[in-house]
Amino acid sequence: MAATTTATPRRAPAAFVVLLLLAAASGASARGDGNGVYEPCADATVSRGDGFTFGVAFAGRDAFFSGGVQLSPCDGRLPLQNTAKLALFRPTVDEISLLTVNASGAGDLTSAGGYMVAFAGRKFAARSPPVFVGNSSYTVTGFTLVFEFHKGTLQNLFWKADGCSSCSGQANFGCVENSCAIKTSSCRGGNGGGGAGQVDCSPGIQLAFSGTDKHEAVLNSWYEVSKLKQYSLFGLFSNLKDSLAGQFSNFF
C-alpha cells in the first residue's frame, strides 16, 4: 500500500455520484453495536461485535492516484466527484460476511471505470489497492477483502486473490489478474447495453478480519476464512440464493 497520507476531511456521499447504497450486511443490532461512527471517512475504534462502516468506490484505476501516490477516496484531491460510484456497508467486526453489490447490470460498474477500492477512516486513510471488477470482455464476481486492525483502529485493507484453478478450462471464463472472470457477454446487462446474458454478475465481497480490537482481543475470522477456502464460501452462498429463488418461484 502507498505511504499513509492524511485525507482531506469530506463527507463521502458528497464526493460521488451515489447510485448504490446498501444496508448493513451482517446486521449488528443496535443493542450490541458500540460503534456510533457511521461515516466511512471518519475514524472509529471498535470491539468485536461492533458494526463498522466502510465504503467501496468504483472508478478507473488511475482515478485513485494523484502524483503517482494512491490516496483514499475520502481525499478531495482525487477527481471522483462526477465519475465514481459508491457502495456503503456496515458489517459486524470479526464475523464472516458476504456482501453483494446490487448493480443493475455488468455495465453499470464497468462503465464507472472497471476497478474498485475499499476505504475507511481519515487519520490513517486506509484504502485497498485498486482491484479489477470488469470491462467489456470479462467480469470478476467474487472477491475476498481483509481488514487489518490494531487495537481497534483500521490500519490496512487488502484483497486476497484466490487464483484461477476453479475456472480453468471453462469456456465462459478467463483468468484476469489472478482471479476467475466470466465473459461479460454472459452477464445480464452485459457490455453495458442490456445484453442477453442470463448470469447475475453482481460482485460478491467476502469479508475477513485480522489483528486486534480495542480491548486487544484477537480477530480470528481471517484464519477461519482461509481454512474454509476449499469449500468456496462465495459459491456456497450463491448456490443457496439460487436454491431459495427457485423454491419461491414455484409458488407463482
PLM regions: where:
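Typically disulfide-stabilized, N-glycosylated extracellular/lumenal ectodomains of secreted
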Residues: 2-16, 20-252
